[in-house]
Design a protein with these regions (language model features):
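The feature captures the ABC ATPase H-loop/switch
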Residues: 121
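Conserved G/P- and acidic residue-centered "switch" motifs that form tight phosphate/ATP-binding loops
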Residues: 118
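N-terminal beta1-alpha1 cap of cysteine-dependent amidohydrolase-like domains
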Residues: 1-115, 125-133, 137-146
Length: 146
């Protein structure tokens, strides 16, 4: 039997989730994203909890072969790109923001491939210096994209 190369390790940053029946926050990612990495990319998915203060980002980036940035319920908070404040009813995920944005920059610096879907594309944009309209459907001249 020939030697097999190890599967690439693809990091999937988690969103912080609050479930009504639990008093503690959960960290998770949608199964469709995990299966896309596992089955579609034939890679080993690794969910990265949103715990920014606990990571050495250069070390973390050096341990993964790719970074898959998923969609999520929350938008990137506007203070990361000097945008106007969110309204009070906007869903937030500051732990994900604080984990993902520096990790993206480090992956780009180290040449680790980065892929984004939905919110993940917003994260790449903001991490690399871009701005957002977090409610683009409310901007004059834009169609409702939802």
């Amino acid at each position: 039997m020939p030697d097999r190369l190890p599967k690439p390790l693809v990091g999937i940053p988690a969103s912080q989730i609050f479930l009504p029946s639990h008093s503690l926050a959960q960290h998770g990612s949608g199964e469709r994203y995990i299966r896309a990495v596992s089955d579609g990319a034939v890679a080993l998915p690794m969910v990265i909890p949103a715990l920014a203060d606990h990571y050495d980002f250069p070390d973390l980036a050096s341990r993964i072969d790719g970074l898959m940035l998923t969609g999520g319920r929350a938008n990137v908070e506007p203070h990361h790109y000097d945008g106007p404040p969110f309204p009070d009813d906007e869903i937030r995920d500051p732990l994900r923001d604080n984990t993902v944005l520096p990790l993206i920059r480090e992956c780009v610096e180290q040449g680790v491939p980065v892929f984004g879907s939905c919110r993940g594309i917003q994260e790449i944009n903001v991490a690399l210096g871009g701005t957002l309209f977090y409610r683009v459907h409310e901007q004059p001249g834009f169609n409702d994209h939802r």
